[in-house]
């Protein structure tokens, strides 16, 4: 995820030291030895993965917070809940490894998916799990459509192919944060906001994946003039319909799995709100892409690209937008926009 290099030996040492420290602390509580090792292993494994994708000292924050979250859940819930949480961890491992093998994710993307999956599967359970799995599985499959056509855009878009950790964080991170906030301060609205953030991610992803299949050039959302396929801020009829379909699917799944099947959480009004928020966020994403997202020009081939480095790793020159505002940050802003929109209207 960053410039720091991590090794298997280092991660193994991290896991073992964390296991010993957590087990020693839990042993003082008088819990059974089996439970101590069980809980310590879960905490140590989660903390190790948090450390593996951290960089530039951020592990000083991610490791203790991640370990505290898992430990708090295990110590404040029943053994049955802890068993279900363990199944969630196992499920997160399977999803991350399988996605890595299928080249849906890079190694850092798989690690980030495990962290996000543990939180969603283990704490949120099925009501939170099914929407994010729907987004991830269907979006990953869509990314494989028109592979040859999309390969031609590799020089323009910042990232392509297997999704890395930042892409996972950009699309699923806001939802994961909302779930954690809902865990700390329980309220039905958190699920609604969670669904809205995923509707935004689904609408944007489906709009992009389906839109690139269009035989006609997209048009700028600002000027409505034709722009090359893959240009940030470009929209098309088929891409917009793809965004609407993605938001509709996510809203529908959220309605079907709403906690306790309570209409008070996601009824018809909430369903329409999630659907509309997803579409609005997708358009907001395109607007940011056309106006504020960083655009660079390669000094070698003169192509305009989202990449900060292009031909043979040569550093590109910024020609528009804000240098720090890349596609991942635009996606996070779009998810935040969807959440804010729901808060205002609801």
Question: How does the language model describe each region?
Answer:
Residues 1-73, 82-132, 136-345:
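Interhelical loop and helix-boundary elements at the membrane-water interface
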Residues 78-79:
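Positively charged, low-complexity intrinsically disordered leader regions
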């Amino acid at each position: 995820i960053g410039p720091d290099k991590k090794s298997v030996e280092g991660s193994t040492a991290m896991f073992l030291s964390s296991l010993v420290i957590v087990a020693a602390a839990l042993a003082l509580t008088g819990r059974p030895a089996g439970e101590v090792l069980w809980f310590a292993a879960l905490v140590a494994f989660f903390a190790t993965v948090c450390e593996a994708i951290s960089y530039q000292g951020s592990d000083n924050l991610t490791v203790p917070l991640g370990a505290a979250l898992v430990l708090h859940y295990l110590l404040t819930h029943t053994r049955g809940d802890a068993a279900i949480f363990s199944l969630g961890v196992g499920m997160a491992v399977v999803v991350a490894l399988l996605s890595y093998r299928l080249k849906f994710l890079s190694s850092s993307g798989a690690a980030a998916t495990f962290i996000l999956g543990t939180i969603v599967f283990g704490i949120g359970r099925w009501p939170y799990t099914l929407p994010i799995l729907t987004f991830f599985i269907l979006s990953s499959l869509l990314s494989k459509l028109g592979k040859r056509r999309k390969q031609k855009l590799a020089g323009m878009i910042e990232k392509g192919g297997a999704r890395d950790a930042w892409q996972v964080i950009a699309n699923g991170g806001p939802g994961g944060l909302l779930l954690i906030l809902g865990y700390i301060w329980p309220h039905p609205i958190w699920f609604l906001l969670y669904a809205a953030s995923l509707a935004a991610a689904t609408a944007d992803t489906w709009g992009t994946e389906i839109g690139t299949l269009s035989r006609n050039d997209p048009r700028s959302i600002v000027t409505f003039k034709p722009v090359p396929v893959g240009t940030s801020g470009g929209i098309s009829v088929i891409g917009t319909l793809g965004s609407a379909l993605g938001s509709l699917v996510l809203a529908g799944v959220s309605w079907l799995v709403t906690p306790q099947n309570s209409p008070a959480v996601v009824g018809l009004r909430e369903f329409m709100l999630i659907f509309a928020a997803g579409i609005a966020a997708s358009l907001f994403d395109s607007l940011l892409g056309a106006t504020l997202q960083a655009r660079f020009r390669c000094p070698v081939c003169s192509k305009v690209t989202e990449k900060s480095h292009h031909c043979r790793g040569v550093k590109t020159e910024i020609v528009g937008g804000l240098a720090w505002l890349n596609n991942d940050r635009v996606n996070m802003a779009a998810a935040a926009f969807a959440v804010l929109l729901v808060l205002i209207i609801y």
